[in-house]
Amino acid sequence: MEGHKAEEEVLDILRLNVGGCIYTARRESLCRFKDSMLASMFSGRFPLKTDESGACVIDRDGHLFKYLLDYLHGEVHIPTEEQTRVALQEEADYFGIPYPYSLSDHLANEMETYSLRSNIELKKALTDFCDSYGLVCNKPTVWVLHYLNTSGASCESRIIGVYSTKTDGTDAIDKQLGGRIHSKSIFKREAGNNVQYIWSDYSVAELKKMMDAFDAWEGKGVSYWRVPHELIECWTLEERPLLGSLSHMAPIRKRRLIVNEEEEEGVNCKTGPKPVRFLGPSTSTQIKVKNSASIRVSPASAPQPWPRATANLAAGGRAVQRSAQSKVPTPVGTGLPEHPQAAQGPGAPENGATHLPPAKVLLSDKTATPHRVIKLRRTPLCATGSSLPACTTPRPAGPPEPPPDALSPLGTWTENGQDQTK
């Protein structure tokens, strides 16, 4: 019993002598395609021709048979040379094996086989396949909407529009028909991807008698019929290919919506100059400095007293005494010496608080560039009484002269005009 089973297993593995090339193959693989010549040869219904070693002799090209044998085992090797591919196709036709000529043929065969086994529509299988690669199945076609009506001896035929998708064409038909699309007088028929609407008072049987080749309509062009006495209208949405070669068309990649975060990441990943973004005005009068006492101010750019603070100090008699002793250059950002009035512009913060003129802070060794002039509107700091006339005293033509305390590198000016040293 065991010897009989072993003999059957040995018979399932066959030795082949194809054009002098020796191969070993399973009977099941050779009979993979039921309608092929190999399946008929090794089905057991016909005697096999063998050589001295017992191998089955097949008088064909042994080198090309290797491609077919690998294909029967589930492997596909497509030759690169055109001459070899043509010769291989002849061998495949001789044995009745659907060997693919190219990779696209192989994918098409596998897709059709998968659709039949899984009971899935081929179009959906192709769509899923393209979705896996982020591609869209596209064919260069347009949809043409024809209109035709006949009444007695008159006939009118025209094109309503050309559309890029069938959905746009269907919407155009709905717009043309309006409420008549659901009428009993409307007859709809389809052929392939094309659709036709016929409006008349005739029944379908009567239309078949009047219209030429009514049942043989394949959706191509407009169907003409024998001229009846009643009015008949016809709308035909036909798919037409664009002129040109498909070989030059590249696959269209799917468009996807990019989230703002992804777009920001994509912009940051790019090299080169980044786009300039508006972050508000270049200057701001709402500047608050914390721990201002710890900021070291350079002597050359020490804050200068403004006219109202000078007038307040002039009440004590010190400003007049120091006016001819020293001349300090104008600080950066307070205007030009020829235009002293530029430092007293009407611009001011909304809360009306008094701010100090800008000072050059030594935060680094880099040379500070001149800033824009900040025009501030200041409230009077003068008290009532004897100091009141000093506020209305006209300023001298030149820039105000500071007291010697203003030249102290450690001094800072407060809002009331007093010097505060650390």
From Swiss-Prot:
Q: Which GO biological process annotations does it have?
A: protein homooligomerization
Known Pfam families for this protein? Answer: BTB_2, KCTD18_C
Query: Where is the region Disordered?
Result: 289-357, 376-422
Comp. bias regions, Polar residues: 413-422
- InterPro entries, sorted: KCTD18_C (IPR045704), SKP1/BTB/POZ_sf (IPR011333), T1-type_BTB (IPR003131)
Disulphide-bridged cysteine pairs: none
The source's domain of life comes to Eukaryota
Q: Where is the composition biased (Pro residues)?
A: 396-406
Task: Show where the BTB domain sits.
Answer: 12-80
- The molecule here is called BTB/POZ domain-containing protein KCTD18
Q: What species is this protein from?
A: Bos taurus
Q: Which gene encodes it?
A: KCTD18
